[in-house]
């Protein structure tokens, strides 16, 4: 396809000096860890700049022609900021000018990201958090950004998610847009500024379900309420390929074909829900199918590939930097080949491996990736659950339930819930072991390929826990099974102290089967259309129910569900 934008995130170089915490928030540049109090630490700036140069060299050679950089808040000064903050911003501006100049010299277009709305106490006091003043402040910020950085191609705006609970520093973003009407007011102001400067506004439709705007990414009514009669050649919509985050087992969102605005479709190379690049999780076979589908989309003008951004984890490989992942780089390369050159997934993979390791048997590598695809789809996911379309309030329920980021959950709550949706339980157990056998075949093939067999052994040991856990989820419980699982986990933790967190708790949770059925029947639906009970109860009063849910989930769900990202509370807003 001849597209205008082959966009990739450029967040990885910033972590070369700041990923020494136990858990890393990969969703944003860790600005506070780059600073020395007065501004950017000069020594860290040198390291980041060198890594950035190498990164740009690699991705432009690969064929990407645009990058995204965090963020507008750290590049725009305001008179009501204290002098110390404006001096710090000035140091960022000087540093970013060097990055922008280098990227532009390499033929890259640069887009600066921003949330609506980034805040601190000075902004809050200045606007009083009145919508009209917030919009004016945002418009003024965009105008100053383009005035001071004329080489930028535009900005990328996120409205449906804000900074994680762990984000520290001079700015934290907050969700301020609650309705389609409010969203239109903000967009009109930003589009007006973009038109004045001939810049592009890339508006991301990603939402987490908070407030009435929270179903924008999948609900056509909300989508049209926001974008209809909002024509502009300077407005591009950026949409994820499905109705939820970067998971498998999704059909393409029909909203990609709605309306008349140009589109960028988002894909993920560093699989935040599938190991963060610690084992092979090839996206090519799925993305080839999506590419065929998107050939019929006349509004498509680009793709956006996430190669480092996304998720919270202690896995710290940096794409195209220190200890980069072969599997992430494979996905980065193959995604571009599939969409730009209409290359098949198999050919894209063999092109990549033959360039990286000349003389490699391409057919064997493809067989290896087919086995990896089977292992992920049939053991990492539980197919019978993953294919079900479930909705809670304004959110499409993810097709992956007992695994999240770098944590595997094995407990009675998960067992009770997952059994509600999986009825072919014996087959699920058997399918899991067949998929585990595929990893064993991968290990044998890896010995004949330029692949680190230790990575595949790590994958096998991780997937082995999942296979045995299925016996607990879907089989009859007995004490010997519990001991067997715990022996596996203990040995795994000993051999892989930096491996996945495995949280196992076999203590029974007391709630009746009839109660589970009633709760799910009330709260979940199998179609996107809202029911009467959704409109009258769940969409209006769920925030009042949340305190009760919080008491329940403190005893039954791991603490990371409360402490990472925006916290589970966002689903009830």
Region annotations inferred by a language model:
Residues 1-10, 15-17, 48, 147, ...:
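Substrate-binding groove of N-acetylhexosamine-processing glycoside hydrolases
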Residues 1-160, 195, 291:
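Feature activates predominantly on carbohydrate-active enzymes
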Residues 40, 84, 101, 129-143, ...:
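Alpha-helix capping and helix-coil boundary motifs
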Residues 74, 116-119, 161-164, 207-211, ...:
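Short, internal active-site loops enriched in acidic
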Residues 77, 165, 247:
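Glycine/Thr-rich phosphate-binding loops of Rossmann-like dinucleotide-binding domains
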Residues 121-123, 165-167, 213, 276-278:
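A generic structural signal for short coil/turn motifs at secondary-structure boundaries
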Residues 125-131, 161-197:
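Active-site cleft segment of glycoside hydrolase catalytic domains centered on the general acid/base Glu
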